[in-house]
A protein has these predicted regions:
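Histidine-centered metal-chelating micro-motifs
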Residues: 128-130, 148, 168-169, 173-178, ...
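Glycine- and acidic-residue-biased ligand/ion/polar-headgroup-sensing regions
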Residues: 135-154, 316-337
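A short, N-terminal "cap"/entry segment at the start of jelly-roll beta-barrel domains
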Residues: 41-117, 217-306, 312, 388, ...
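Short histidine-centered beta-strand/loop micro-motifs
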Residues: 129-134, 160-161, 180-181, 312-317, ...
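N-terminal secretory signal peptides
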Residues: 1-18, 25-33, 38-41
């Protein structure tokens, strides 16, 4: 059974056996966040919430409960067992090196996310993420500071660019690249890979390549004396300190100037672009292969929801959604087939997951703007709006299904708003 078929099986048949088949870490996290709902009868649940039935005189982690009120005591509309929908970067260990750190949320931590893995990385000013390449595409969003990125095309042409908060880059699979923190305080960024099981240890590092090649072969290949490579690192560098580089123009000249310049643009100014959709409730900025041609396998949206606003009810027919919460507080309900639904809470630095075709909304439950990223292992961003569907069907059909008459139907927004 391939990955897509296994995911579809989990969604369509969210059985106890599927749930118990997940890793022990995921099960612990799921229990920790209250992400598995027991079947509830709405009337019984509503009555229980008003009497002594929901009291908990025993032990509790109040700080955690305060962050996850809907995860612990879900609304009565929740029902059944579902796949894990939540994790947090604050629960995973940091790999700390001189020059920065990294940590990851992958399929191991969030087993339902088979298509995407995420990393959060920090580089101090001048420090490098070692020159490397890997088997997955790398899509990144800058959360803080500034960085310089380089990537070489297979034809030998080079792209060099500087990025800052709100910008992104894409490195295609197999293309060698590097990242360096700039002044005054380096950078922090989110990395998204289109392989759910991708690992920070699964990259091909320049230092390791050189260390594992016979010196005489390196000499023959490069034309350098074999003794030159005696000073090469014997251990992986991965993240290591360096000196803040000079100007971007100087680096471009140093590598060969226009003669070796890439025809392709690998960076994009996402936060500063005009919103794709905007309303009183917030905005959505979409980036995919249509406006960023280099990003052929990863699409994304930067969503801002005002207090009390709502990322409208919708679903994605072409890909599962991997979310990263940058700021604010939110709750999300995800609807699954066979009468299953689950509501979970999110805070900054959390990760959310929604299987393809699962209906959901994201509501701002805080008093500041909610800011998050939606990412997809796809070339295009595609979503289906519930409101738009309800307005497009004949009024008699809507009346027959939901008892909404024609006059009431006219009050539903006719166009896809993105945020309400």
């Amino acid at each position: 059974m391939n990955e897509r078929a296994r995911e579809r099986s989990m969604i369509e048949h969210p059985s106890r056996r599927n749930f118990l088949g997940m890793s022990s870490l995921a099960l612990a996290t799921t229990a920790f966040a209250g992400l598995t709902a027991n079947a509830q009868e709405r009337a019984s649940t509503q009555k229980a919430e008003q009497d002594h039935s929901s009291s908990d005189p025993g032990q509790e982690n109040k700080a955690l409960l305060d962050l996850n009120p809907n995860s612990n005591t879900p609304p009565p509309t929740d029902h059944g067992d579902v796949v894990p929908l939540w994790y947090s970067f604050d629960l995973v260990k940091k790999r700390v090196e001189e020059g920065g750190w990294t940590h990851q949320v992958t399929e191991r931590e969030l087993p339902s996310s088979r298509d995407i893995a995420g990393f959060n990385m920090r580089l101090t000013a001048g420090s490098y993420r070692e020159m490397h390449w890997h088997t997955a595409d790398e899509w990144a969003y800058v959360l803080y500071g500034k960085a310089r990125v380089t990537v070489m095309n297979p034809d030998g042409t080079m792209f060099l660019g500087d990025v800052e908060e709100g910008d992104l880059w894409i490195f295609p699979a197999g293309f060698p690249h590097s990242i360096q923190g700039l002044g005054p305080d380096g950078t922090e960024f989110l990395l998204v890979f289109n392989q759910g099981a991708f690992s920070e240890d699964g990259t091909m590092l320049l230092s390791e390549l050189v260390a594992h090649m016979p010196p005489e072969v390196l000499s023959k290949n490069t034309g350098l004396d074999a003794s030159v490579f005696a000073n090469a690192p014997k251990a992986p560098l991965y993240i290591f300190p360096g000196t803040v580089p000079g100007s971007l123009a100087a680096d471009k000249t140093d590598v060969g100037g226009e003669q070796v310049a890439s025809r392709y643009q690998y960076t994009f100014h996402l936060k500063s672009m005009e919103p794709t959709k905007t309303s009183k409730g917030g905005s959505v900025r979409i980036v995919d292969s249509r406006n960023f041609p280099a990003s052929k396998h990863i699409a994304a949206a930067l969503v801002i929801v005002k207090p009390a606003g709502l990322r409208e009810l919708h679903w994605h027919p072409n890909a599962s959604e991997w979310q990263f919460y940058i700021a604010g507080k939110a709750r999300m309900t995800v609807f699954f087939p066979v009468d299953n639904a689950r509501t979970v809470d999110f805070n900054a630095n959390d990760v959310g997951y929604v299987p393809s075709n699962a209906g959901h909304y994201i509501e701002n439950t805080g008093d500041t703007d909610l800011v998050f990223l939606e990412t997809f292992a796809s070339d295009e961003f595609v979503d289906v709006s519930l409101n738009q569907w309800l307005r497009r069907v004949p009024s008699e059909m809507l009346q027959a299904h939901l008892n909404i008459n024609r006059e009431q139907a006219q009050m539903i927004p006719a166009e896809k708003l993105g945020v309400i």
